Structures are given as C-alpha cells and as structure tokens.
A protein has these predicted regions:
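A short, compositionally biased
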Residues: 2, 33-38
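Residue-level signature of the cytosolic catalytic core of signaling kinases
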Residues: 21-25, 126
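Conserved AMP-binding/adenylate-forming core of the ANL superfamily
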Residues: 19, 30, 38-83, 87-91, ...
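Structural core segment of the AMP-binding/adenylate-forming
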Residues: 67-68, 95-163
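Short, flexible loop segments at the rims of nucleotide/cofactor-binding pockets, characterized by
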Residues: 17-21, 53, 100-103
Length: 163
C-alpha cells in the first residue's frame, strides 16, 4: 500500500521516497561513531555522551551479555526509563545478535510475567527504580538474570539541576 495524500504539501526540494540501507541498526550506530566520534549522541541532565563513548559502552555491554550466555536470537527484556542506559542497552542487545523486548516501565508483576513467558526471555536489563518489580521474577519464572542500571552513571557532576 502506498500513501500519497501528503505529496501535495510535501516540500518540493525533498524526495518523496527513500531507499533504506541494507545495514543493521547497530551498523548504523557504528558508522555514525566512525564518522562523527566527537559529535554528541545523547545529552542527559546536561551531560553529553559522544558517539565514541556510546559505541565503547555498547561494545562493552554486548560483550558482557555474550559472556553471560546471551546468544543470537535470544530475547532480552529492556525494562527502564528513557536514559543513556536505555540507549546503550538497546544497541548492546542488538550487537549481541539478540532481540530487544522493550517493556513499558509502568508495567508491574502480571505484565512482567506475561512478557517473560511469552518471549522466553532469560535476561532482563532494568532501571534501578524497577528492580523491586523484576527481581522477584527470578524465583517465579524462567528469568535467570537481571542486570540493574544506575541512572546517575552519566549525570554531569557539576549540574545545577535539582536531582
């Protein structure tokens, strides 16, 4: 199905179609990091994260996931707020050739049990404030490991924000 009704108001200098690259989402990050290593990839509470740092963090986390037994095609729950940790975790899961299962941080026990059972996830990357909801699942589901992220890791120590 092709949608064209917007073409009448589309800017004339922009193409109406585009060819998608034959690359993975992770490869696109890798290319950006090689081309623009010192450009800002993420800003979090006034602290910029450069593409070089983002790629290094992603590679380290992907290596950790693989060392923990995450293999190609495994499903990994991603249960945290929008943050640099989310971005790093998302790309790291992809880099490990696993499948990202994003879980809304508003979900609690019943929904979490469903996600774990439905996807067969054995590993979860969770934000610190959500650990209390996901850690009990280690005893009642097939979940084997929870990695908890601390949100203050990437905060600029000199920020004047009220944290």
């Amino acid at each position: 199905m092709t949608f064209t009704r917007h073409h009448s108001v589309w800017p004339k200098e922009l193409p109406k179609t585009m060819t998608l690259p034959d690359t993975s989402v992770f490869t696109n990050l890798e290319i950006s990091a090689l081309r623009y290593p010192d450009h800002t990839a993420v800003i979090y509470y006034d602290a910029p994260m450069r593409y070089r740092q983002l790629l290094a963090e992603v590679e380290a986390m992907a290596g950790y996931l693989q060392a923990q037994g995450v293999e190609k095609g495994d499903r990994v729950l991603l249960y945290m707020q929008n943050s640099p940790q989310y971005v790093v975790s998302y790309y790291a899961i992809l880099r490990a050739d696993a499948v990202v299962i994003p879980v809304n941080p508003m979900n609690r026990a019943a929904e979490l049990e469903h996600y774990i059972a439905d996807t067969g996830s054995r590993v979860c990357l969770a934000g610190q404030e959500l650990a209390g909801f996901i850690l009990p699942m280690l005893d009642s589901t097939d979940l084997e490991q929870v990695v908890v992220a601390s949100y203050n890791t990437y905060i600029n120590k000199d920020t004047d924000l009220d944290l």
